[in-house]
Amino acid sequence: MNQGQKTWLLNVLDKGFPNLKEVHHGSCTGSDEEFHNFATVLKLETHSHPGTSVNPKVTVLNRATLKADVTYPEKPFLVRNKTISDTCDLLIACPHKNSNTGGTWSTYNYAKRTGKLNILKR
């Protein structure tokens, strides 16, 4: 996440949803990790959904080492992304690139297609 996204997200988590109790993320380094840390500071319950490759020969290198309140079993990335979207009431996406490809975009686009309330913050 860029600094503007971080500032915005922390404010939204802290003040935007007073009834917010739990958050879900994909357990990757970078944005998921930062999101998890914000949620932890705000004493929100954290749910981690680690992803794995469908190819057993591929090692996942971008998994964050996080102590979530709830950690779900690994699922292939695209399946995991849909699970995260299906599980939440609101999906917040903060892509780090202007490209419309990758896991963040896959999850965001799935949420849009399925009518999930979503926010995209560039």
PLM feature segments, named:
Residues 1-122:
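Acidic/glycine-enriched connector segments
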